[in-house]
Each structure stands twice: as structure tokens, then as C-alpha cells.
Amino acid sequence: MGLEVAADSVASALAAQAGGAMRVELCGGLDGGGLTPSFGTLAVVRERLRIPLYVLIRPRVGDFVFDAAEVEVMRRDVEQCVRLGCDGVVLGALDRHGQVDLATMRVLMQAAGSLGVTFHRAIDVSADPSRVLEDAIALGCERVLTSGARASALEGIDTIAALVRQAAGRIGIMPGAGLSEHNIRALRQHTGAHEFHASARGVIAAQVPSPHPYIRDLGGDYQRTDTARVQRMVDALQQA
């Protein structure tokens, strides 16, 4: 049982490790739901991290229906993860009917080779999460990250519990979205899940005050994984 931390910087990844996370999911643009991280970020994190590193492969924001060019971008990103010695990748692709795009997933998983694969929250916007779960099992994914098709895992707690029962040990079900030190124990007890996913972030104040506060997307405060929050969440899990 343990906590995977979503990190979008070197500092966040190392903070997750220091707090006792069992694994890091590295991404970029976490505030937009997460994108594939930059090569530089990935390379430096791989060099410095001692715990397992999984990498989100998502070329853009928006839905999870990808065209041929986007699939090629993702395939090359997966290959880069293999070359850098990452432990796994986080994937997900749907077709226009809201079902798993099996052809795309097979291309990406073939590129991943022996790397572990997590099927991400595309399941939460699919037409049938139960069917997506079976497809993820058939594809050979290790786990599915899900909020139970709701805005937060706490809201989707009953669906997550049902997916855990359906999985019956064939694949991991990892609750994510809105997890904190205040609710992770309840999620563990109600769902029976063994792995949990959170960013565990806190606000970092801007080092240089902006002379133009009306320009909100440049400069200013930002968020970073908080080691103490990670530790509190890990402790809460151990007490569950």
C-alpha cells in the first residue's frame, strides 16, 4: 500500500521522494490536467530520483481521441522514456465512441516494451468505465487511475469501490483527484484500494513581486509538492 505523487518539476519529484511516496508520476502542466513533461525535466528527474518513475504521455489538453500525428508523437515520447530508463508510462486513448482505442494503445504499449503501464483518467470520461477496465486488463496494464468518473475521488468513492470489486486482483485500481491527508484514510477503508494518487501541493510565493498584478499568467505564485503533506498522507494510509 502506498502513495503515488503527481509531480510537474524536479523539485516536486524530489519532495515526493523525501515525503515517503512510493512512486512519482512525472508530468508537465499539472494545472491543466497534466501533459508529457519536457525532455530536460524528465532527464534530470531520472538522474536524481531513487524511487520508481512513471511518465505521463499526453501531447495536449482536451479529449483523449488522438489523430495519427499525435499517436506518433506519443510513441516517440514513450521510446524516450525507455531510453532514459524510466520504470513505466501512463497512457490512455479513446475512440470517438468513448471506448478504448485499442489500436493506439497497442502501438504505445509495444513501444513501451517491458515498462509498466498505468491506464490514466481517460476511463473517467469514457462511455463505460467497466468495459474500459476489462480492456485495460486485456491490454496488460498494471493499474487504472480513476476518480470514479466524478470530479473527485471522494465523490466517486462508490464507483471506485465497484471497480475494485470488478478487478478482483487482476489489475490495480488507484484512486486519484482531490485526495488529501483529510480523506485518504476514508477512501482506503471504503474502496479497499491499495495505491493512491495525489499531487500533495502547497503554494510557493513568488520571489519577485510583479509590478503588473493584472498579468496573472506570467510570474506570481505557483504550486509545488509539499514534503510534509506527502508524509502526512503516507502516515494516514499506514494507519488505515
From Swiss-Prot:
The encoding gene: cutC
- HAMAP family of this UniProt entry? CutC
Molecular function GO terms recorded = copper ion binding
Q: Give yes or no: UniProt keyword Heme.
A: no
**Predominant cellular place of this UniProt entry's protein:** cytoplasm
Q: Which organism is it from?
A: Xanthomonas axonopodis pv. citri (strain 306)
Name listed for the protein in its UniProt record: PF03932 family protein CutC
Keyword set, alphabetical order: Cytoplasm
Q: Which family does it belong to?
A: Belongs to the CutC family.
